[in-house]
């Protein structure tokens, strides 16, 4: 049963590549407040975990009810621009700003838009567009549901 679900997810992902879906049509900017997270573990300055280093994080809030339920995020090569999907059938994009130590400091130019099928239709039904993950390959965007 798990294997058939995986195959179904992969097929759906292939159908929703950027050649069929245009996620980044014009959308209004959404105000995002960013609060830096300086420590991985409260009360500890430990930043190295094996070969990984915690560079910082952000707590993001917004007065816009659409913001939330983030399922996946991917950064482009410039490490600033990002794109992602939500559990509620939305795309989002924005830019991550970094401080002088290269730690995340804020999110700007944040926009959201409905995920659309190959016919340009979005859905008000969560189960049809409940995105769980996102991957980039060249100019294609793959979404898992």
Please report, for each region that a protein language model flagged, where it lies by residue.
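Sequence/structural signature of beta-propeller domains
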Residues: 2-5, 15-145
């Amino acid at each position: 049963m798990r294997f058939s679900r995986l195959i179904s997810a992969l097929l759906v992902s292939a159908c929703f590549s950027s050649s069929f879906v245009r996620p980044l049509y014009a959308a209004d900017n959404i105000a995002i407040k960013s609060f830096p997270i300086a420590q991985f573990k409260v009360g500890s300055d430990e930043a190295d975990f094996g070969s990984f280093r915690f560079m910082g994080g952000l707590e993001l809030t917004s007065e816009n009810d659409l913001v939330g339920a983030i399922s996946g995020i991917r950064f482009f090569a410039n490490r600033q621009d990002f794109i992602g999907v939500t559990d509620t059938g939305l795309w989002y994009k924005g830019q991550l700003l970094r401080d002088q130590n290269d730690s995340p400091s804020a999110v700007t130019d944040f926009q959201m838009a409905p995920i659309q099928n190959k016919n340009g239709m979005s859905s008000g039904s969560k189960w049809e567009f409940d995105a769980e993950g996102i991957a980039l390959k060249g100019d294609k965007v793959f979404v898992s549901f």
